[in-house]
């Protein structure tokens, strides 16, 4: 597949309009907001046609997204996405990678979220007729493998013909847009501030993609506040998101 075709596929897969199920998850952000742990924000003078003073939490949201990128996606999810991309024709290797994610993800809510989003993505690709999707769905339904998101991204996007670099871009951008979109729906920020955060985060994405990821045996994640928030999410009285 040529570069432009691969890039178009990456844009499609990373689009929030793509029905992959990721929009239902805040990955701990909702609990942090409810508990007042996201930060007080900064009072700034509003622009014309807005209130005189508004609360800007862009820095806090950007910090949350940066933490997820650096200490979870780059060192963990990206590792398994690339390993699955490389092993897309080897079902045994894919199920082993799936099992590693299951074992290394300590928070039950994160395991459930990764499985549910992964299986939602898989279901869409089965409906679209993506090569290899139906066969792997049979493995998931038979209970032979959990179907975690990074493994399915690597498998499915490889089978679509997406280039390795474009797969990583789609995954990183999709994570960022999902988190920032959650912040907007939680009333933490408006759409313009959300776009500023996404723009500000782009240099970090390119910086991380320039680094060699760890091997699956060395994969790790360390986002304690987010993980605790995810575990506490079910105790919230009002919940907009699944975690």
UniProtKB/Swiss-Prot annotation:
Gene name per UniProt: ureF1
GO molecular function: nickel cation binding
Predominant location category: cytoplasm
HAMAP family, sorted: UreF (MF_01385)
UniProt organism field: Pseudomonas syringae pv. tomato (strain ATCC BAA-871 / DC3000)
Role according to the record: Required for maturation of urease via the functional incorporation of the urease nickel metallocenter.
Superkingdom of origin: Bacteria
Protein family (similarity comment): Belongs to the UreF family.
Name the record gives this protein: Urease accessory protein UreF 1
Subunit structure: UreD, UreF and UreG form a complex that acts as a GTP-hydrolysis-dependent molecular chaperone, activating the urease apoprotein by helping to assemble the nickel containing metallocenter of UreC. The UreE protein probably delivers the nickel.
Signal sequence bounds: none
GO cellular component, one term: cytoplasm
Location in or out of the cell: Cytoplasm
Protein keywords: Chaperone, Cytoplasm, Nickel insertion
